[in-house]
Amino acid sequence: MRNLVIALLMLAASPALAQDKEKLSATDLTVRTALTFKVSDTVVQKLLPAGFEVNSPTAGPSKGSNLNMTLIDYLMVQDPEGKPLPPRTTVAMSIPAKKTASGEAVAVVFGGFIAQAAIPGPYFVFGSAKLAVDRQSHTDADGKSIIDETWEVTADDGGALEVQLQFVRGVPARGKAEPKIHSAAKPEFYRIYRFEQAADVVRSTATGIDRVSKCSIKATGPKLALLFDGSEQLISITSIPFYSRSIYVPAI
């Protein structure tokens, strides 16, 4: 009985111990569009810091991809006390990876774009750019919803990114996760996302889903040309009309 009591006390204390090891950094609410690609493994591996290796999904709509581009339209951002922070449109570039020593699956953010006032961003890798997003939704009398999106990035280094999409909205799938995201510039630094989302996969080469009627991706400049040289393969497009996240960092 005594051992059982001790075990129960340890189990009850474990969430508190986890909380002691991390602290809330921010909460936010965003609308996202996530694109995944297959590019040269050699090129992608060179973007990862020592101790990490490419870990492409082996199942699901993004099966076989090794590059993530996440287009983020912030609706609301709050600090740990609930005070508002400036919402900034962001493009984040990351790689599905794993730690070589432990095999732990993580994501590594190696680049992206954000407004000049926010550089180098939370992962110390974002470049300064002017970003704009235009999104339109039309629902007909039969309930069919068509979404048009245009994302435009004009980077201060001369690079540019334009993504134009048109797709038929499906029924989003609700889900939640707690991924750990590392920085390529400071690989020992990471953030933990605890999020809930509604995700609508509108194109996937792995599953055969395709409700996209228009897709144009143009990428130029020193940071993008290495990845988008014409040989890249678009693996999936996921529309995420609802993404609610709490961000935690290790407690110092």
Where are these regions (language model features)?
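Hydrophobic alpha-helical targeting segments used for export or membrane insertion
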Residues: 6-11
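Short, surface-exposed linear patches
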Residues: 55-60, 92, 117-118, 174-176
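N-terminal domain-onset segments
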Residues: 19-74, 205, 210-223, 227-231, ...
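Aromatic- and glycine-enriched beta-alpha-beta binding-site module
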Residues: 74-155
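Interaction-surface and assembly-scaffold signal
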Residues: 128-252
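Positively charged n-region of N-terminal signal peptides that target proteins for export
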Residues: 1-4
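N-terminal signal peptide c-region/cleavage motif recognized by signal peptidases
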Residues: 13-15
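Short linear motifs at secondary-structure transitions and domain/linker junctions
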Residues: 42-47, 66-73, 85-86, 122-130, ...
